[in-house]
Design a protein with these regions (language model features):
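NUDIX/MutT-family hydrolases
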Residues: 237-264
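Short, well-ordered beta-strand micro-motif
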Residues: 111-113, 142, 224-226, 250-252
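Acidic, metal-coordinating catalytic segment for phosphate/diphosphate chemistry
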Residues: 103-147
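Active-site-adjacent beta-strand/loop module that shapes the phosphate/pyrophosphate-binding cleft
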Residues: 114-118, 212-234
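Conserved Nudix-box catalytic region and its N-terminal flanking loop in Nudix hydrolases
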Residues: 129-134, 141, 146-190, 240-242, ...
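Glycine-aromatic micro-motifs
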Residues: 1-90
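A short coil-to-beta-strand element that immediately follows conserved catalytic motifs
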Residues: 199-206
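Short amphipathic beta-strand and strand-loop transition segments with alternating hydrophobic
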Residues: 92-103
Length: 290
């Protein structure tokens, strides 16, 4: 097809999806696309082009959603976190000399050579580092302030198994990856519905944090989800399409804190959320009764 741009006529190709089952969405709006997707799209393109000439398009296509999620996380990281005590990084404080990706699928591995300014002002020299690249995720601990109960989920975790843990089933807060175009709170609400069939009445931020910044890029956005658990039963659920096998537990707040004390609540999002719940529990209960 020929198009006219700035008064000049030029030939253009039109992409038409092979899948005849594609359904029509909302009317496309350029300004809305730019606002929501442009920077994510550019970050996505940077990673995709690293595979140019190395990976066939049909192999890369199933990875696109994961690549977009990583691209969005890199964009979210550009927010300005507080630097009241720690060093405030400026231009030239960190230099990336080289980057390699020996593996990229749902997650990615990157080999970096970086250098940074030391606390004494000297240059660190080239440092070889490997990082595990994972997109941002949201976690939510459902709490009923009327019954003073929480909902935990339990599932097999391959990370615990790979470490050699003889008990690789993990008690956790509800959690999931933040999908491209989705906010952390939207992801928390969606995951509560998918994993436990819950509708949350309020979402209270716990905090955002790296779980292991020495080796992993994953940044967690944790919430406490206020909800009514009076008619919710423990059971088995999860999305079949994602091979999820999830068991839910409705337990008292005191039982939760006993799990924290014993070490059975052995993962950072649950520990952090439980301790924050302990700090704010009286306020939640007062608001529910008032």
């Amino acid at each position: 097809v020929d198009v006219v741009v700035d008064g000049a006529r030029s030939p253009a190709s039109v992409y038409w999806p092979e899948n005849a089952g594609v359904t029509q969405g909302a009317v496309w709006d350029l300004d809305e696309w730019v606002r929501r997707w442009a920077e994510i799209g550019m970050n996505t393109a940077r990673e995709v082009m690293d595979f140019y000439g190395k990976t066939a398009p049909h192999v890369l296509a199933p990875r696109m959603n994961a690549i977009r999620a990583r691209a969005q996380s890199a964009l979210t990281a550009q927010a300005h976190p507080p630097t009241t005590l720690r060093h405030r990084a400026g231009p030239g404080d960190v230099t990336l000399d080289s980057i390699g990706r020996p593996y990229a699928d749902f997650f990615a591995l990157e080999d970096l050579v970086v250098r940074h300014t030391r606390f004494d002002g000297a240059d660190s020299g080239p440092l070889e580092r490997a990082i595990f690249v994972a997109p941002d995720a949201a976690t939510v601990l459902p709490y009923d302030p009327v019954t003073d109960q929480v909902l935990l989920i339990e599932q097999f975790r391959v990370g615990a198994f790979g470490r050699g843990d003889p008990q690789p089933w993990s008690l956790e807060a509800i959690a999931g990856r933040i999908d491209p175009g989705e906010t952390a709170s939207e992801a928390a609400i969606r995951e509560a519905q998918e994993e436990a069939g819950l509708t949350l009445s309020d979402l209270v931020p716990v905090g955002g944090y790296y779980c292991s910044p020495g080796a992993k890029t994953e940044f967690l956005h944790s919430f406490i989800g206020l909800t009514d658990l009076s008619d919710v039963k423990s059971g088995i659920g999860g999305l079949a399409a994602e091979n999820e096998d999830i068991r839910s537990h409705i337990i008292s707040f005191d039982a939760l804190m006993a799990l924290v004390e014993s070490g059975e609540a052995g993962n950072s999002p649950l520990l952090i959320s439980a301790l924050q719940l302990a700090r704010r529990r009286a306020d939640f209960q007062a608001n529910a009764s008032g």
